[in-house]
């Protein structure tokens, strides 16, 4: 795993860095990590509407691969935060397990189990989560990246 600028290698092959001044301020105003659905409202979703050539019958394998490559290129996507106190807030990036990463962060939003029916629908259903997630919404051809409110993005 490459170490992004400003990050340090720590135990168990993890990399970490302390929160910067703005991240610490944000963390404090949203309740010191005690986020609820109503308080986790500073996040933004990033959405693109995609089109595929007729030769691509199923875009999901391509999107999963692109999401995985994006994680390799930007390890910060997998960052979670921990703290022993409000004065010791740190982002931590653990070694990447490809299968677990895809199972826990890539979602196809279709059928009765879909969380979102469109990217617009995501605005009213902003869910708290521990890391950034990607959502493919076939009904609208939208690919949405949804960072956590405390994400280092």
From Swiss-Prot:
Domain of life: Eukaryota
Any one annotated GO CC term: nucleus
Keyword Transferase part of the UniProt annotation: no
Record's keyword terms, sorted: Nucleus, Transcription, Transcription regulation
Gene3D superfamilies, per the entry: Chloramphenicol acetyltransferase-like domain (3.30.559.10)
Localization of this protein: Nucleus
Main location: nucleus
Keyword Ligase: no
Cited InterPro entries: CAT-like_dom_sf (IPR023213)
Role according to the record: Transcriptional regulator that may regulate the expression of the satratoxin biosynthesis SC2 cluster, one of the 3 clusters involved in the biosynthesis of satratoxins, trichothecene mycotoxins that are associated with human food poisonings.
Further comment found in the protein's record: Trichothecenes are sesquiterpenoid toxins that act by inhibiting protein biosynthesis.
Name of the protein described by the UniProt record: Satratoxin biosynthesis SC2 cluster transcription factor SAT15
Underlying gene: SAT15
């Amino acid at each position: 795993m490459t170490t992004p600028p400003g990050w340090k290698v720590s135990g168990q092959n993890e990399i970490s860095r302390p929160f910067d001044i703005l991240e610490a301020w944000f963390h404090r105003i949203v309740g010191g990590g005690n986020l609820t659905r109503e308080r986790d409202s500073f996040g933004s979703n990033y959405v693109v509407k995609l089109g595929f050539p007729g030769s691509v019958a199923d875009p999901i394998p391509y999107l999963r691969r692109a999401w995985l490559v994006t994680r390799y290129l930007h390890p910060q996507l997998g960052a979670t935060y921990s703290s022993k106190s409000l004065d010791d807030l740190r982002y931590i990036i653990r070694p990447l397990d490809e299968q677990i990463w895809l199972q826990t962060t890539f979602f196809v939003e279709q059928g009765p189990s879909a969380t979102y029916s469109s990217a617009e629908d995501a605005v009213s259903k902003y869910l708290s989560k521990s890391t950034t997630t990607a959502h493919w919404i076939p009904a609208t051809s939208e690919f949405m990246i949804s960072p956590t409110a405390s994400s280092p993005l």
